[in-house]
Amino acid sequence: PHVLDGVARARVFPYDTTTDGGKPVQASATLYEPTAPWRGKGERPTIIFAPGTRGAGDQCAPSHAGMGLGSVGLSKVGSPTINANYEYGFYMGAVQHGARVIVADLIGLGMPGHHTYVNHIEEAHAMLDAARSGLELAHAPQDSPIGFAGYSQGGGASLAAAEFADSYAPRIERSRNLLRRPAG
């Protein structure tokens, strides 16, 4: 894991999820675990975040932005790419206040496969499965309080996760939903 500004350990992890047709696929996410102990009531809260669209190539995945403000690189065909992690301030603000943050790449970004842009069922599955896997990786109870958040495409993904939580992931204890300008 990487230590970010002394306030969090971050690591990218793969997890299993399903397409809207029920086909198993792998996706990736980043877990930001605060280094300070939780001082609030109950279990440490977790925010499952889906970023806005940065592009459709694997190099555009949030987990490929590096563990900071972004990255510069080359695409598979050799053209230059910039992956700006413009939500980094949100992640660090949440972590500094003691929340765990899991940033979902969504299906087809950062892993083999085609990015299924704004497919609300697959976005919901990806966010809910990122929550389950991230909580397990953090050794946190599956019923820890979580909230969904996102911006642009991620705002729509967070709404979809809230909509499908009871039927797709009933063990997840959803406590809040926060979105910023869903795509539409």
Residue ranges and their predicted role:
Residues 1-39:
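Catalytic-loop region of hydrolases
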Residues 28-31, 42-55, 59-68:
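Short beta-strand element of the alpha/beta-hydrolase
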Residues 43-46, 96-102, 142-145, 172-176:
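Loop/turn elements at helix/coil->beta-strand transitions in domains of secreted/extracellular proteins
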Residues 51, 67, 71-110:
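Conserved alpha/beta-hydrolase
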